Amino acid sequence: SSSFSRRAATTEGYGMFALVEYLYNTSNINYVDKNLIGSFGHSAGGLAAIRGAQYFGKQSKKLSEENKLHSVFVSGMVRMGFKEKDIKHVDSNVGLSYALYDEGSWQNELKNGDMSIAPEALNLVRHQVSDPSISKIGIDSFYGKLNDRNLTVVHNEKVLHPMQPYLFEPMKNQIDFFLKTFNIDRSIVATNQVWHWKEFFTLVALVCSFLLIVPFAKFLFSKYPSGPFQIIVFNLDILLINKLIVLGPISNPIS
């Protein structure tokens, strides 16, 4: 979503808070299980996800009702949203994935990407299982119970931050988390991923679009019209060429 707010992740979840409210309260979308609404985000989107868990956690305690956000998965973000004062409001299942070689890990409390001893990750796990004595996290191990809405897992893949949405292991961890928390039949295993073919053919389309710029421009100018339509066609030609050069194909990773 777009917002003029500089705190859009915290105050709006980039639009996710309103979307969850709509899904939960409307009768228009009857194919969504209102008791199994989840949220996933990477990087700044990860901040929005954990802020959502906190926002709806506060709301559920205030109204004495079940949290509307059943489960959240946070990818590539711990430097914000994981302080004790924030985490104490969470009462959703939480999955955390942080790249061991994240180039932004210098911003974390210990200046590295090791989640087994990261204070931010420890704050999460300690709160979820109500055990302040935990001093080291078992990576890829589940803590808490699904029925208590405090199931928690921390992943620490040996990759870079921007590669998390583009590699099989991080994607598998995300899928497995929601399969587990939503009790979904695992007839299709999380390793059976096909999204990478979309990215591959998007790359092919990008290369082809650049290769076509010169021959396409030559074709447009080869049979140039005369008369009053000449200026109009010329402007359209320039517009099309600029669009090819500036934009090319646009792709959004599946996450």
Q: Which role does the model predict for each range below?
A:
Residues 1-194:
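Soluble extramembrane regions of membrane proteins in the secretory/endomembrane system
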Residues 192-255:
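Core alpha-helical transmembrane segments of integral membrane proteins
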